[in-house]
Regions:
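Terminal peptide-recognition signature
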Residues: 50, 93, 135, 172, ...
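Short acidic catalytic loops
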Residues: 158, 162-179, 239, 243-244
Length: 340
């Protein structure tokens, strides 16, 4: 027993020595690299961390020549002493990898974002000709659970009011929806969604994370994202739905469109969406700055992945959302709802 304990002690000691030697070697190499760009070690490690996050997590990471990118970015950061000195280099990296859905924000910018009070337009709804229900959802930059619940209540109040006219034909207008909290939008629209699984996030390794709507709750996988404070509501009739999309339909607005994609009796009208059909995730750096990156694609319930934008079933060459009865996209939707 004594010799066994002694062997274990010796092995642990050797392991610690190896770790110390490797750490010392790594630190020496890091200092050499930092010196080669006339950067402080702190600034170099900070920039290295940001680049490593991009290289490992960015949704299009496998299409990028990272060696070339890093060379140019480190050159941009030459002479950096403080972590903040590397911010222009990080912005350059975002530009070089053509990252245009997320952002990089300094600690002071993050403080302003957290204090900013976002206002959102409530949904517009009305009964159109031929007893067609019209519901338009705008951008919803959620700030709190209270705001999510208020938004959900507004959307469901609109749906219940329209459904009281015994409608079975619906128009969901997403042409002015540039994103925000997709879960609040999907929860509000729950009565119009016909399946529990309404879409997926797709990781770079192919892993699928389902979007679920059930019993007035929306989930990402098995994790609850939002639960309605209202009782569940069921439509009087099986809905036939026209979804309107366009160039200003973006991000979570595209997620809502994807949730209806593949549903029976649904057709899309308008123009191609913005092309931000992906999920973003915030990565916080050591000084409090935030790097928001797109990390997962959207897929509809049938497994179709939207790598860029989403195309309508019927392209309508018209100006973006006028919310007018003379709107050609609305007219095309009404024609399909009533005649096909």
């Amino acid at each position: 027993m004594y010799w066994r304990k002694k062997k274990i002690f010796i092995l642990i000691s050797l392991l610690l020595i190896c770790v110390c030697l490797f750490s010392g070697y790594y630190l020496k190499i890091t200092i050499q690299k930092a010196n080669s760009y006339s950067m402080s070690t702190k600034a170099f490690l900070y920039l290295q961390k940001a680049l490593n996050i991009m290289e490992k997590k960015f949704i299009y990471k496998d299409t990028i020549d990272w060696d070339s990118i890093k060379k140019e970015v480190y050159k941009k950061a030459e002479g950096s002493v403080l972590t903040s000195d590397t911010y222009p280099a990080i912005q350059l990296a975002r530009s070089l990898i053509k990252e245009n859905h997320g952002f990089f924000a300094s600690p002071s910018q993050m403080e302003l974002l957290e204090k900013e009070e976002f206002r959102f337009e409530p949904p517009i709804y009305r009964l159109l000709e031929k007893n067609v229900a019209y519901l338009s959802l705008f951008t919803f930059p959620s700030t709190s659970d209270e705001a999510d619940q208020a938004y959900n209540k507004q959307v469901q109040t609109a749906i219940r009011a329209l459904d009281s006219s015994n409608v079975d034909k619906w128009i969901i207008d997403l042409r002015k929806n540039q994103g925000g909290n997709m879960w609040a939008m999907l929860l509000g629209l729950g009565p119009l969604l016909d399946k529990e699984c309404i879409g997926f996030f797709i990781r770079n390794n192919g892993e699928k994370i389902p979007w679920k709507h059930k019993k007035n709750t929306v989930k990402q996988g098995n994790s609850c994202c939002l639960k309605s404070s209202l009782p569940p509501y069921q439509l009087k009739n099986t809905p036939k739905i026209a979804v309107l999309i366009g160039n200003n339909t973006a991000s979570s607005g595209e997620a809502v469109a994807v949730a209806f994609s593949g549903q029976k009796n649904v057709r899309f009208f308008g123009q191609h969406t913005s092309g931000f059909a992906n999920a973003t995730y915030p990565f916080f750096l050591s000084d409090g700055a935030c790097l928001l990156l797109p990390v997962m694609h959207f897929s509809n319930r049938l497994g179709q992945i939207f790598y860029t934008n989403m195309a309508p079933d019927e392209v309508i060459n018209a100006n973006e959302a006028t919310n007018s009865l003379k709107d050609p996209t609305i007219e095309a939707a009404i024609d399909w709802l009533c005649n096909f």
